[in-house]
Amino acid sequence: EQKADETLLTKEAELVGIYMEGPFISMEKKGAQNPLYVHKPDAEMFRRLQKEADGLYRVCVVAPEEPGAMEFIDSVKGEVRVSVAHTTADYDTAKEAFEHGARQVTHLYNAMPPFTHRAPGVIGAACDNENVMVEMICDGVHLHPSTIRTSFKMFGKDRIILISDSMMATGKPDG
């Protein structure tokens, strides 16, 4: 009789999708991304990478203030879910990106301008558009508990995706 752990070891993992967090981001808000790989939004580059990845890219991050970003969103929105992130975008630019077809915000509050009473930025634009989902890293490091509670009141539970950010800040090695 085979043990459960032996059965697991004989099966291979299957990659079901890739989250493309870069290279189409703002150099100013690149976060932990390697600056050598930051690139202006480029639909043909995306398609080459998508082909090399056997079509596994499911989400592609873009900073909408970058030159060519709106055209990029228009071009790829039918091929991949476009998410706004690593951005210096103001409210109007983010709103325009959502109108062009971006449907998500990666790492809400992180690597983007803060939400203020006179400059609501990406956060305010996302809140105003019912078609936009937002991701939050609720690890006790990235967001204050009050920010998490307030976000649930702003967006509602059906528009929030809870994620981890598996990188060095979690206290674990890459991988």
Segments (PLM) and residue ranges:
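Histidine/acidic-residue-rich, glycine-tolerant segments that coordinate divalent metal ions
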Residues: 2-120, 171
